[in-house]
Amino acid sequence: DMFDDIFGNMFHGGSASGRSRRTSGFTGGFGGESFKSKGSDIKAGITVGFDEAAFGGDKVITLSNPENPGQPGQSLKVHIPAGIDNGKSIRLRGKGMPGTGGGEAGDLLLKVTVAPKPGYERKGMDVYTTVSVPYTTAVFGGEALVHTLYGDVMCKIKEGTQSGSKIRLRGKGIVSMKDSSVHGDQYVTIQIEVPRNLSPQARQKLKEFEEICQGSSRTA
């Protein structure tokens, strides 16, 4: 199909190839009258970074024609809405197939793929991370430095915190696409660091601690 060959384009700068969906137009009607028909939409894909999807912004992609690989491609500015997620589409109106009989052009639909970010997992508007805390901090309580999309924060670790416990950071998740005043949350899973290569003194103190705990459990 000639249109597929022309518009089966490659998008550079964070996107993949796309194919057009063509609908028939009618021209040369009765008495030579021309019937307007809107052009078909083109569907393609675009990959955006984790932070780009979270905060939004503008991204420039290049639309190239495979029949003229030596010619410079057409540059398009794409606005990434803050909060967009995997599988959502961005519509660029009038950037699809040309219409017939003077009809308007179709649209370009870019299906979004959000690239992963090490240490972060997204589920809807919520973000999930982990933080490692020393054994002593878990026992006695303290604070731990937690990375968020909005910068680092110090989180309180309660005395006697168990491995696998979760801390909820309200409003540190992804912004809602429908209401910019609404944000998801960040859930931080606690991982307790088991001490290694203990000094003889530390080992002795830990043994004493173990004996005290065992004694307490017997008398309880």
Where are the language model's segments positioned?
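Post-J-domain flank of DnaJ/Hsp40 co-chaperones
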Residues: 1-71, 77, 100-104, 109, ...
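Intrinsically disordered, low-complexity linker/assembly segments
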Residues: 74-220
